[in-house]
Design a protein with these regions (language model features):
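Extracellular, repeat-based ectodomains that mediate carbohydrate processing or recognition
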Residues: 1-420
Length: 420
């Protein structure tokens, strides 16, 4: 499918699920222009209709599943085709009829898969039980969020405890008086109801939780500023409480500096069941088209003590680093990289430079260790264009990608973007 910004999650038996943002330009001619504005268009939101320029199978954001360690992939359970448009379509197609823009996926301790798909104005929830093989949600279950959302982050744990961070991009009036671009929503009934009103003070953020334990972590920029620090907020009681000034959330802990303001360079947090938690982020001390740095912070005691160091691998742009951790403390890192020294071109960020996917894994890293990164896909993800060189545009691979480690820690899967 044509899409970008993929998210990936894995169940305890190795079933994997990917969602990706759909490119609306591939929705068909004039899509999604309402019929009243374009009489020769039978309606908006076209999906896989003969003679139209589209790869869409359905209206929801992409949702793919693999039940054989990633060897083969297909659409997730109950995500059948919805050919046509919003006026003439298959309304018996299940979850795929719920129009979406982009989403996120998480898995709880019961191996229930939770897929959130945002419509920007609100969100749909899709729940799949039995390692993600059985769709169990009523069609188009609406979340009823209080604020518009541009990017959802989801973490699940226990039996139906769900944490959702919504990027509202602003601080709308809310109940606790906190201010922040992200809002936190909490559910303990599998997403049927959510708490409201809680903004998370700070800048760009991500969230992770233990599946079987009680710990939840939010990594964030301390503020929406050019430079500052990366902080971690911790709850050891499933994120319960009435806000970030009380309840079970501790005060933010500084884990490292931020230098420059990388495009969508938010910190990514992940953890395991044994008390290890790590954060990775990109820094841009030389501007968006100069050499970037990757910083990494890790704690082996539930976030009490931290070690932080620079783990940069190339002289170039190191974008959107992502971290995964096994229960045996195998730590994988991956990033999109553009090496200024590998092409013999005249200049750094210039037309013809190639982006590649880099990945590596390290057992129980300590301060000063280096990952032996390799190019994971020999095919370039993207080649810099003349326009991108002239405008300093480094956004060709969009905002992020994700990885997972297998349950036994012997392999890891990467959901990433490759431009056509």
């Amino acid at each position: 499918g044509i899409g970008y910004e993929p998210s990936i999650s894995i169940t305890s038996n190795g079933n994997m699920f990917i969602t990706a943002h759909k490119d609306l330009r591939w929705g068909g001619e004039d899509s999604p222009i309402p019929i009243i504005l374009d009489p020769d268009d039978p309606g908006p939101w076209w999906a896989c209709t003969d003679g139209r320029e589209t790869t869409w199978d359905y209206w929801a954001s992409w949702f793919w599943a693999s039940y054989d360690n990633g060897t083969t992939w297909g659409h997730g359970e109950n995500f059948g085709p919805t050919p046509g448009n919003m006026l003439f379509a298959n309304y018996l197609a299940g979850g795929s009829e719920c129009l979406g823009d982009e989403g996120d996926i998480s898995v709880d301790a019961m191996d229930t898969v939770y897929y959130l798909d945002t419509t920007l104005e609100d969100n749909w929830w899709h729940t799949l039980v039995d390692h993600g093989t059985e769709y169990s949600t009523g069609v188009c279950q609406r979340m009823n969020t209080m604020a518009a959302d541009d990017r959802p982050w989801v973490a699940a744990q226990g039996d139906g405890i769900i944490h959702y961070l919504g990027n509202s991009g602003a601080s709308p009036p809310e109940c606790t008086g906190d201010s922040g671009r992200y809002w936190y929503y909490h559910s303990e009934d599998g997403g049927n109801t959510f708490s409201q009103c809680y903004a998370v003070p700070g800048g760009w953020s991500t969230i992770s939780s233990q599946r079987h334990g009680s710990y939840v972590y939010i990594a964030q920029e301390n503020a929406d500023t050019q430079s500052g620090t990366v902080t971690v907020r911790i709850s050891d009681e499933y994120g319960r409480g009435t806000g970030f000034g009380d309840g079970t959330w501790g005060a933010p802990i500084d884990v490292g500096p931020r230098e420059g303001n990388c495009p969508e360079g938010y910190p990514v947090v992940n953890n395991n069941e044994g008390g290890t938690v790590a954060v990775v982020w990109a820094d841009c001390p030389n501007g968006s088209t100069g050499p970037w740095e990757i910083r990494f912070a890790i704690s082996y005691d539930y976030g009490t003590n931290w070690s932080t160091w620079n783990v940069s691998h190339i002289n170039g742009i190191q974008m959107y680093p992502f971290v995964s951790i096994s229960d045996e403390d195998l730590v994988s890192l991956a990033f999109y990289g553009l090496d200024f020294d590998d092409g013999g071109l005249d200049g750094d960020y210039v037309e013809g430079e190639e982006w590649f996917l880099y990945a590596g894994a390290l057992q129980t890293p300590v301060e000063g260790d280096s990952w032996d990164f390799k190019i994971a896909d020999p095919e370039p993800l993207h080649v810099v264009t003349a326009y991108e060189e002239q405008s300093g545009d480094v956004h060709a691979l969009h905002d992020f990608f994700e990885t997972v480690l297998s349950p036994d820690g012997t392999w890891f899967g990467i959901a990433y973007q490759q431009n056509l």
